Structures are given as structure tokens and as C-alpha cells.
Amino acid sequence: MFEYVTGYVEYVGPEYIVLDHNGIGYQIFTPNPYVFQRSKQEIRVYTYHYVREDIMALYGFKTREERLLFTKLLGVSGIGPKGALAILASGQTGQVVQAIENEDERFLVKFPGVGKKTARQMILDLKGKLADVVPDVFVDLFSDEERFDEKKGSSTELDEALEALRALGYAEREINRVLPELLKESLTTDQYIKKALSLLLNGKR
């Protein structure tokens, strides 16, 4: 229905952003809302309009490739929008594709809501079909090697990051296991989320 929406970010929350376009605020659910910043500068968000009998929602992504992976994940039995967002929010796109190609169920079950059955279904449905979502232009927006110019964060940023992790489906016990590492840092909300997801996916759960 919509290819993309352009506008400025009026609100950023744990689950979604509000993009103002010509005076209309679009609620757009994204993998990691905190990669966006409130600003009067116009941006473009690639969108996917999800419609079911009990829900109608707009999902947004920074690239077409990210959106394409989202739609492919939705095609897997057992994965809904929330699960697909959690996988994308990890920022480990290359690792996800590699795990599918290598039939690595142990890596895939680390994501919220993905059990062994769903992991096997992901491999069955997507193996050999993801080359078009990881071209050279598809950069890892969540790389630990990024260099940030923003000022360091505070406990407010950490609180926001924890809320975002809960919104993605991570349990309190999982969050609490990585919290000591996060408390050692002074980061922005986006950086806290990336750090936490990196720890969660590398076995510290």
C-alpha cells in the first residue's frame, strides 16, 4: 500500500516512532526506534502495511532490504511481526542469514519467541532465498564498531533501552543477566540497545 513515508520524527518510544507527514502523525513500529532521533529534518522510512482481522499496523525500516527480510520472516509459520522485529533489532543480519544457511538452530533459538520448531521452519523456508536481502549496500546499522559523536547517555537512556528490550519480547531474567554489563557503560539509548542485544545473542542470557 505504501512504499515509504517521508516526514520528520515527532516522537520516539520503546516500540514505535511517530512520523509527522503534512500534519498527520503516522505511528510506525520499527525494530529499534532509537536509531531515529526527534528532529525537524525530513527523513524517509520504508513501510510495510500489516493487515489482519484483529490488527492493522504500519511497520517501518531504514532500507528496502531490511523491509524485505521482515516480509520474508513473516512468511515463516510461527513468526509474527513482533518476532520478526526482534530478529531485525538484533542488528545481526549477516549472522542470521549465515545461521539459516548453516542450519544453525542453536543461534536462531536465541531470539524471543523462536523455539526449535520455528527455527527449523526458518531454515526450511528461507535457506538459499536470502541473497537478495544482504547485498553490499545492506550495512549493519547496529555494528559494535560504529563511532558515535553524540554525548554519553545517562540512566534515562538505560531505562529507555530496557523498555525497548521488553517490548521486543525479552524476559526480565534475560535482561537482568546482561544488566551488570550495561551498568558499567554510559551510552545513548540506541547504544545501550545494541550492546544488550549483542550480549544476549552471544550467549550471555
From Swiss-Prot:
Protein's UniProt name: Holliday junction branch migration complex subunit RuvA
Assigned GO CC terms: cytoplasm; Holliday junction helicase complex; Holliday junction resolvase complex
Organism: Bacillus cytotoxicus (strain DSM 22905 / CIP 110041 / 391-98 / NVH 391-98)
A Gene Ontology BP annotation from the UniProt entry: DNA repair
Region (Flexible linker), start-end ranges: 142-152
Subunit annotation: Homotetramer. Forms an RuvA(8)-RuvB(12)-Holliday junction (HJ) complex. HJ DNA is sandwiched between 2 RuvA tetramers; dsDNA enters through RuvA and exits via RuvB. An RuvB hexamer assembles on each DNA strand where it exits the tetramer. Each RuvB hexamer is contacted by two RuvA subunits (via domain III) on 2 adjacent RuvB subunits; this complex drives branch migration. In the full resolvosome a probable DNA-RuvA(4)-RuvB(12)-RuvC(2) complex forms which resolves the HJ.
Its job: The RuvA-RuvB-RuvC complex processes Holliday junction (HJ) DNA during genetic recombination and DNA repair, while the RuvA-RuvB complex plays an important role in the rescue of blocked DNA replication forks via replication fork reversal (RFR). RuvA specifically binds to HJ cruciform DNA, conferring on it an open structure. The RuvB hexamer acts as an ATP-dependent pump, pulling dsDNA into and through the RuvAB complex. HJ branch migration allows RuvC to scan DNA until it finds its consensus sequence, where it cleaves and resolves the cruciform DNA.
Region feature (Domain III): 153-205
SMART domains per the UniProt record, alphabetical: HhH1
GO molecular function, one term: ATP binding
